[in-house]
């Protein structure tokens, strides 16, 4: 499936059914971004979101939502495809702050958090992960919440949603680099 849809599914998709959950305000945008047939969709009662059924997602379903992690095939894809994967992740479970344009990806699945960090590193983006007890409506859920923070600039395509893109900031030349750069790639000799 497309990297964008795969990323969105990792964040807001049903692990065992070919479905994703989309915020009501994003329905039209997400429909245009996913690039796959939506066989049906319906509004969730009182949740402010819709469920999209996308048959092509059957190819990536797992036994439990706890089994979600970015596949090596996607982590080793082209740079353009990895950016699209990040966009799907950020459009589903990420946010870009208004103050410093800091991006945050949030999940309760540790191996997904670790694979998101690997994706960011592969794009040259420094990041940091913290964990804290997860709560819902102020009540502990018994799970751990993993937050991955990184800084983004207006020349980095971390989201496709206009409400998130508008929060990115212009890159300042005289600041410490927020990236790692590759100097050389050499084959291993066995």
Q: For each predicted feature, which ranges?
A:
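Intein-associated homing endonuclease modules of the LAGLIDADG/DOD-type, together
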Residues: 1-137, 147, 174-190
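C-terminal polymerase-core module
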Residues: 141-145
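Phosphate/diphosphate-binding loops
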Residues: 148-152
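Long beta-strand-rich cores associated with HINT superfamily self-processing modules
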Residues: 153-170
């Amino acid at each position: 499936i497309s990297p964008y849809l795969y990323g969105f599914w990792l964040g807001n998709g049903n692990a065992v059914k070919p479905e994703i959950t989309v915020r009501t305000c994003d329905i039209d945008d997400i429909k245009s971004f996913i690039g796959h047939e939506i066989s049906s969709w319906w509004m969730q009662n009182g949740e402010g979101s819709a469920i999209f059924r996308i048959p092509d997602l059957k190819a990536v379903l797992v036994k439990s939502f706890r089994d979600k992690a970015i596949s090596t095939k996607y982590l080793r894809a082209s740079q353009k495809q990895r950016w699209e994967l990040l966009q799907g992740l950020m459009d589903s479970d990420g946010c870009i702050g208004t103050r410093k344009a800091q991006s945050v990806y949030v999940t309760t699945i540790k191996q997904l958090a670790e694979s998101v960090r690997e994706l960011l590193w592969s794009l040259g983006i420094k990041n940091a992960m913290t964990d804290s007890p997860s709560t819902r409506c102020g009540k502990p859920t018994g799970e751990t919440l993993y937050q991955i923070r990184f800084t983004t600039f207006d020349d980095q395509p971390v989201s496709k949603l206009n409400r998130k893109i508008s929060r990115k900031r212009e890159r300042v030349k005289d600041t410490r680099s927020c990236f790692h750069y590759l100097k050389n790639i050499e084959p291993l000799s066995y």
